[in-house]
Amino acid sequence: MKKTALLLAALLLFLTFPGRAGADYDPEVDYLSIMVRAAACGDIEAGRAAEICRNEKIDRTGSDEVKIAFEDLFLLAKIITSEAGSERLSDEWRMCVGEVVLNRVASPEFPDTVKEVIMQEGQYEGVNTDEFLYYLNPTEASVDAALRLLLGERLMEPQVVFQANFPQGGGVYARYYDSLYGYTYFCSSSNPELYW
């Protein structure tokens, strides 16, 4: 944790006092790794600063890397932690939780941003609490799952937009069982024609 804090402090110093006139990013720095570490320790300022530098680096170098908003990475990792953060649950389970959020963002049936999907009334329990909003830092496994999803990895079909402890919607696509938590079902929309 100390190492991460020092790295993030160094990034902030670099951004405040760039070594070369007009240089806003260092081509040698892996800003995505900084965003990941910032998400895992809840350092929003460092994560946003790294996002800005990474996007500028992508634009200036003509890279085909996917741009990722730090807010999306952080919020997606937080909801994955909230819904499937236990170490006893599989990476696949975590990926499915996050994928439901991204499938909803892409769906005509739900809001258009990660934040709006997560905060939509009646959808995710506890997201409007101080615990979720201010104190919950995502686990490293949840940040990894969120990153993989934002980079395009998928396990389910686009119409899988529900996650609950009971079947719902247009049918069960996948289900996971844990002896402590019981079943979690990942279910399709009742309107599959919207997804083809």
Task: Set out the residue ranges of the language-model regions.
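Bacterial extracytoplasmic/cell-wall-associated proteins, especially those involved in peptidoglycan
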Residues: N55-W196
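N-terminal secretory targeting signals
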Residues: M1-I68, W196
